[in-house]
Curated annotation (Swiss-Prot):
Oligomer status and interactors: Homodimer.
Cysteines joined through disulfide linkages: none
Entry-linked Pfam families: HGTP_anticodon (PF03129), tRNA-synt_His (PF13393)
Gene: hisS
Example GO biological process: histidyl-tRNA aminoacylation
Main EC class the enzyme belongs to: ligase
Protein name (Swiss-Prot/TrEMBL): Histidine--tRNA ligase
Taxonomy of the source species: Bacteria, Bacillati, Bacillota, Bacilli, Lactobacillales
Length: 428
């Protein structure tokens, strides 16, 4: 029987998993410096969690959800995005209570699942990095979230990215805009795509996100939400924009930006990368916004919230083109070679001691001939080769060779007890 991975999935092998680890660690370090803490939620939830949060008319729910009935008759779905599960955890664990400092800031790095057409940077099992902040309705919470996304892309070395930003206002604004869109699209309903005709009666905002060719002729003249904003929404949006101006963050006010999920309210944003070697037009790598009613939707108290998500597959595609130096294999610090009776266990001890000091170290578990051990040291990219023979073992010494220039050093076993002392002797 030939076993293959399912369509739309990939094996992240050791030769590339280190690249993923580096990207994720960069994100973790940045989020922790901003006092965000990791949260881990189940990879599957009750179907209603996602159908209610994402919207029954969203592509995610209508076309892309992996859902099934389990053996207990429960309607279950694999998570298609990260926010809904985090909100459910926030409510179920009563994190809205006084025992938790607000805003409550978390991040996650996890696998998601959507039934999409597999293509470069997009798979049916994909990985997402995200942040969520609960409890503050202040404009600086929006600014902070946008800055985290901006700074992460900068730290990773992403080039030619641009912030697109818009606001959806509050529920009253959205209702007025909803009615305006219905009035605009109804006379041309028969000329719209099948999906947009269906959405017109449920959520016409989704039409603005349509990629269907037959819809494009109507989108440019569609009503703009900025014309329906109340004074409070305008003032809040202008505060966010003014803050970004003062902080030197460039942006484009994008009237067509609506985001693909129904739970967004207030400010929404996307970071788009313009790279002709990857895509014909600028493409989104990070997106998010404010969702002030989702906690209430899941029977929690009124709680403002804001967050964003990044698709790792697409991000990795960008970095492989724009910052390949980030993914260069750094090799290991030490490879311990040994020959002679009694040197095998000492080689193990030396490797463990070096690891305890924070170095990466490997020895030859196959105990091959010395020449073969040196070849392996070269193949794994060792910076230093430690040679341990019967003579060195008897004298309590080690010979260390720096492969970059061939310089050799003689060390005592006791030199391995202190990292600073060791470095002073081999980095001359």
């Amino acid at each position: 029987m030939r076993v293959q991975r399912p369509k739309g999935t990939v094996d992240i092998l050791p030769e590339t998993s280190g690249q993923w680890e580096k990207v994720e660690q960069t994100a973790r370090d940045l989020f922790k410096r901003a006092n965000y803490h990791e949260i881990r939620t189940p990879s599957f939830e009750n179907y209603e969690l996602f159908s209610r949060s994402s919207g029954e008319t969203s592509d995610v729910v209508e076309k892309e959800m992996y859902d099934f009935e389990d053996k207990g008759g429960r309607h279950i779905a694999l998570r298609p995005e990260g926010t809904a599960g985090v909100v459910r955890a926030y409510v179920e664990n009563k994190i809205y209570g006084p025992d938790y400092v607000k805003p409550f800031n978390v991040y996650y790095i996890a696998a998601m699942y959507r039934y999409e057409r597999p293509q470069a940077g997009r798979q049916r099992e994909f990985h997402q990095i995200g942040v969520e902040s609960f409890g503050s309705n202040g404009y600086l919470a929006d600014v902070e979230t946008i800055l985290l996304g901006h700074d992460l892309l900068a730290e990773l070395g992403v080039k030619n990215y641009e912030l697109h930003i818009n606001t959806l206002g509050d529920s009253e604004v959205r209702q007025a805009y909803h009615d305006a869109l219905v009035d605009y699209f109804t006379p041309v309903k028969d000329q719209l795509s099948e999906d947009s005709q269906r959405r017109l009666g449920k959520n016409p905002l989704r039409i603005l996100d349509s990629k269907a060719e037959e819809d494009q002729q109507f989108l440019s003249e569609a009503p703009k939400i900025r014309d329906y904003l109340d004074e409070e929404s305008k003032e809040n949006f202008n505060k966010i924009l003014a803050s970004l101006d003062k902080l030197g963050v460039k942006y484009v006010i994008d009237d067509d930006l609506v985001r693909g999920l129904d739970y967004y309210t207030g400010v929404i944003f996307e970071f788009m990368v313009d790279d002709p070697t990857l895509w014909a037009s600028p493409s989104t790598v990070l997106g998010g916004g404010r969702y002030n009613h989702l906690v209430e939707e899941f029977s929690g108290p009124e709680t403002p919230a804001v967050g964003f998500g990044i698709g790792e597959e697409r991000l990795m595609l960008v970095l492989s083109k724009q910052n390949p130096e980030m993914f260069e294999d750094q090799g290991i610090d030490f490879f311990i070679t040994n020959i002679g009776e009694g040197t095998d266990i000492k080689a193990v001890e030396v490797a463990r001691q070096l690891r305890s000091l924070g170095f990466s170290a490997q020895y030859d578990v196959d105990q091959k001939k010395l020449k073969a051990q040196f070849r392996k040291a070269d193949r794994v990219g060792a910076r230093y080769v430690v040679t341990l023979g019967a003579k060195e073992l008897a004298e309590g010494k080690l010979t260390v060779k720096r492969l970059s220039d061939g310089q050799q050093f003689s060390l005592e076993f006791t030199d391995l007890e202190d990292k600073t002392n060791l470095l002073s002797k081999i980095e001359k």
